[in-house]
Amino acid sequence: MSRLWIALGALAGLLTVAMAAVVAHAIPDDTARRIAHSGVEMQAWHALALLGVGLWAPRGGRLADLAGAAFVLGLLAFCGAVYALAFAGLHAGPLAPTGGFLLMAGWALLGLSALRART
């Protein structure tokens, strides 16, 4: 699974750069641009987190893989909801907080995998 997390982290990083360019040049409204920028920041940090999970997963076991899954689902939910609001004015209900919870769960699972690893 470690190669999958690295590949998904690289994809998320690539899309972060693309979204940053779109946000900087295609959103004329300041409020919408600030909202979208928060999604770009969260996406950037968690792209790096996925790369870290990919490097750690061979030693971190199942908990590390669960952390990677939580990061991916959290990115899709949180950033998707933020981008929908910024670009289309669509309120996605509980999707953003659910995504935020999944991102936090990913960090907790990653930390727990480090504490439980046998080294």
Which role does the model predict for each range below?
Residues M1-T119:
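Polytopic transmembrane helical bundles with strong interfacial aromatic enrichment
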